[in-house]
């Protein structure tokens, strides 16, 4: 295929190994790669935007291979994509990639994910966009994930990427010999046991650390072929999960179940 203009962002920051691996893999295929991502980790910021402070962007080419233009941005992941599309890039990219995230973005966790938000910003602008994550916080072998993400994105572009489609790719933490084939999945519904750790600062004032863990993954009752597994169950089989997402959050239940308006 002809070289693509690719914008890459993330929420783990400009120093993260995942984004560096993805950018280098894309450039090695002959694509024109630009990185615009947070200057430090900004995980779990969702689609937040910076409105009460200026946004600064500094060149960070030295962190990547020759030929890759890079900026570290003081804003959120969504800020980074907005800034890139409206100020930093001379031309609209053909593709936006977000990741490789250092940890999973499965099920309803996507609503908190800065990685998914960066890709969603591209989808809202009508640009083919894919978020890619390793489904483990400890796994640090990113090369296979980068190649798989590029294969899927290039294939989707060759087949004419549907409008308003965001692809969310999660990759199991295993080597290629143990990994199954990628498959289409539905979003699971993740339920957490939320916990706050209450502490006191040196002046005796209380503060809190949020901690929690997923205690239940429910099958979604929403749209999607029923034969598709959930993204969580797909990962549990050591197979990459690919979930099609759209920005339209309109409720699709029975309108007769809605509360009556006075």
Curated annotation (Swiss-Prot):
Compositional bias annotation for Basic and acidic residues: 220-229
Compartmental location: Cytoplasm
GO molecular function, one term: nucleotide binding
Residues noted as binding a divalent metal cation in the record, renumbered to the chain: 11-12, 43, 101
Cross-referenced InterPro entries: SurE (IPR030048), SurE-like_Pase/nucleotidase (IPR002828), SurE-like_sf (IPR036523)
E.C. code: 3.1.3.5
Polar residues bias spans: 231-244
SUPFAM superfamilies xref list: SurE-like
GO cellular component: cytoplasm
Cofactor(s) demanded: a divalent metal cation
Region forming the signal peptide: none
Domain of life according to the entry: Bacteria
Protein name: 5'-nucleotidase SurE
Organism: Prochlorococcus marinus (strain SARG / CCMP1375 / SS120)
């Amino acid at each position: 295929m002809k070289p693509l203009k690719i914008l890459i962002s993330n929420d783990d920051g400009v120093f993260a190994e995942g984004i560096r691996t993805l950018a280098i893999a894309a450039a090695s295929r002959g694509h024109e790669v630009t990185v615009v991502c947070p200057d430090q980790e900004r995980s779990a910021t969702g689609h937040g935007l910076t409105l009460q402070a200026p946004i600064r962007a500094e060149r960070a080419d030295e962190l990547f291979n020759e030929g890759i233009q890079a900026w570290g941005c003081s804003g959120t992941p969504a800020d980074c994509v907005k800034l890139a599309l409206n100020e930093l890039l001379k031309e609209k990219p053909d593709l936006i990639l977000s990741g490789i995230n250092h940890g999973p973005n499965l099920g309803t966790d996507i609503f908190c994910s800065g990685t998914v938000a960066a890709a969603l910003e591209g989808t809202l602008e009508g640009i083919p966009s894919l978020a890619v994550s390793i489904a483990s916080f400890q796994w640090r072998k990113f090369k296979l994930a980068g190649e798989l993400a590029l294969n899927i994105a290039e294939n989707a572009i060759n087949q004419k990427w549907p409008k308003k489609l965001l692809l969310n790719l999660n990759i199991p933490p295993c080597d290629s010999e143990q990994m199954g084939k990628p498959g289409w999945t539905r979003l699971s519904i993740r339920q957490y046991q939320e916990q706050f750790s209450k502490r006191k600062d040196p002046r005796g004032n209380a503060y809190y650390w949020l901690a929690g863990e997923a205690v239940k993954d429910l099958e979604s009752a929403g749209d999607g072929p029923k034969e598709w597994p959930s993204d969580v169950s797909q990962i549990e089989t050591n197979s990459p999960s690919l979930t099609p997402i759209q920005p339209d959050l309109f409720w699709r239940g029975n309108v007769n179940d809605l509360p009556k308006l006075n």
